[in-house]
Amino acid sequence: MKKIYLIMILFFATASGVFAQTTNIVTLMLKAKSGEAEAQNALGEAYYDGKGVTENLTEAVKWFTKAAEQENAKAQYNLGICYYYGYGVQYKDYGEAVKWYTKAAEQEYAEAQNSLGYCYEFGEGVDKNLKEAVKWYTKAAEQGLPMAQCNLGVCYKYGNGVEKNLEETIKWYTKAANQEYAQAQYYLGKAYDKGDG
């Protein structure tokens, strides 16, 4: 008898969770269809991750685009990611990715600033420009984004777009490492091992 009660409790707990999730998606869809940019981006993320709906990258791009065109920085960044990797679009398009990263980066969206810096560093979708890469990495790093802090540290280590400066290298690696960013922790350990720190 206890097994039956336990099974019923588990069933209803699961069913109520599914019901709540379905209700949230329906509400999100209604808001997105009414033109709310944040809801459009959130719905795009739901389709991208397959949370509450079946994963559908084409639908994700559709909703990211609607929100991005309303100047939603997170959606612009998400759309840039889709074009960069070719998710939900016909093919990878670095130029289109840079366009959307730039729009989000100009709104101080740190992840987009870092991604834009990466594109400039490696000449993906834009002409290679190390000074421009450093500019965008710095903006994101100053906002506390550990990946950008690590990338900026690498630029200072090798003199990419800035004058070589081991003190700055260690400073930025340390900031990223203190946020548990594994790559920066590795680089910092290597620097101390070589006596650079």
What are these model-predicted stretches?
Residues 7-8, 18, 29:
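Cleavable N-terminal signal peptides
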Residues 42-49, 78-85, 90, 115-122, ...:
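Hydrophobic face of amphipathic alpha-helices that form TPR/SEL1-like repeat modules
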Residues 33-36, 49-51, 56, 69-72, ...:
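Short helix-capping/linker turns of helical repeat alpha-solenoids
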Residues 4-14:
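Sec-dependent N-terminal signal peptides
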Residues 29-30, 58, 65, 95, ...:
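Alpha-solenoid helical repeat scaffolds
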